Amino acid sequence: MKSLLVLALLAFGAVLVSAHHLEMCEKSTDELREQLVCHRQHATGAFNAKLDQVNRQLRCNNDICTFKKLCDAPDFLTELRKYFTESEINELHELANQCDPDAHHDHPHCHPH
């Protein structure tokens, strides 16, 4: 019974992560740039290094190019999982909550100026 609850919570978490990431895909280039600058400022060194690696893998010169390519995939979360671990995806979700002025979550937000 406990394992079913854990699986249900994990599935619910994946839906929340996916929904927030799709919000990133709907942003204008300027909005996305602002959010990704904030991500870089607040991410761990390991996450920033991984994002640099993914930029190279996708032949992108910047994070905007990378996220636009990831957003162009039919399933954004599946595409993220090709490049990032679940832990890294969770960090990305936390960064999105922190940096997105339009996020509808009860987390503190970063509003870069």
Curated annotation (Swiss-Prot):
Subcellular location: Secreted
Disulphide-bonded residues: 25-71, 38-99, 60-65
UniProtKB keywords: Antibiotic, Antimicrobial, Copper, Disulfide bond, Fungicide, Immunity, Innate immunity, Metal-binding, Secreted, Signal
The UniProt record lists the keyword Signal: yes
Domain of life: Eukaryota
GO terms under cellular component: extracellular region
Entry keyword Signal: yes
GO biological process: defense response to fungus; defense response to Gram-positive bacterium; innate immune response; killing of cells of another organism
Main localization of the protein described in the UniProt heading: secreted
GO terms for MF: copper chaperone activity; iron ion binding; metal chelating activity
Signal peptide: 1-19
Function: Has bacteriostatic activity against Gram-positive bacteria, but not against Gram-negative bacteria. Has fungistatic activity against some but not all fungi. Binds and sequesters copper and iron ions. Copper-chelating activity is crucial for antimicrobial activity against M.luteus.
Name of this chain's protein: Antimicrobial peptide microplusin
Organism: Argas monolakensis (Mono lake bird tick)
